[in-house]
């Protein structure tokens, strides 16, 4: 709207978020400006607070408000099993199954040469340090079952030391799907039915 530049700016910012197209951005903007005006200061404060305090866990790269996230601080995790995921949302999806008791490493993405995302963007140095820990017995690659997710798992498998079991979550997760949208039961079965990566 040419006569409301601040709304145009809001729409443009919302469109930069994944999954929000031009029409959705416009609807959200109208809703906030017309029906939910009292929500806008609260949203602004929540954004500022999150921006100020949320950081990346020093051990696994998950989102946290402390140097270590709750998973890494827990004394009840099996430190011999490391599950590598693409995003904090994927970590949460696996945690919500109640099946996995090991530790995590969050890549914050996947390899995608066409998008200019190479190994350096995936915190490989930090992952390599985790893979070098002496108590590690198994690495589970729980990257999304997409071409990029498969390529990422295959590439990272080459970094795993000899003697450490390498597995991939089972195909109960639909090909082309994303972990954060898979139901708990399917994701739990996929974790239980994981396979060795070289099979």
Swiss-Prot record:
Stretches assigned to the Toprim domain: 80-174
UniProt KW Metal-binding keyword: yes
Zinc finger (C4-type): 57-72
GO MF terms held by the record: DNA binding; zinc ion binding
Domain of life: Bacteria
Residue ranges the record marks as coiled coil: none
InterPro entries registered for this protein in UniProt: DNA_Rcmb_RecR (IPR000093), Rcmb_RecR (IPR023627), Rcmb_RecR_Znf (IPR015967), TOPRIM_dom (IPR006171), TOPRIM_RecR (IPR034137)
GO BP term, pick one: DNA repair
The entry's keywords: DNA damage, DNA recombination, DNA repair, Metal-binding, Zinc, Zinc-finger
UniProt entry tagged with the keyword Acetylation: no
Free-text function comment from the UniProt entry: May play a role in DNA repair. It seems to be involved in an RecBC-independent recombinational process of DNA repair. It may act with RecF and RecO.
HAMAP family: RecR
Family: Belongs to the RecR family.
UniProt xrefs under NCBIfam families: recR
Protein name per Swiss-Prot or TrEMBL: Recombination protein RecR
Organism listed in the record: Acidithiobacillus ferrooxidans (strain ATCC 23270 / DSM 14882 / CIP 104768 / NCIMB 8455) (Ferrobacillus ferrooxidans (strain ATCC 23270))
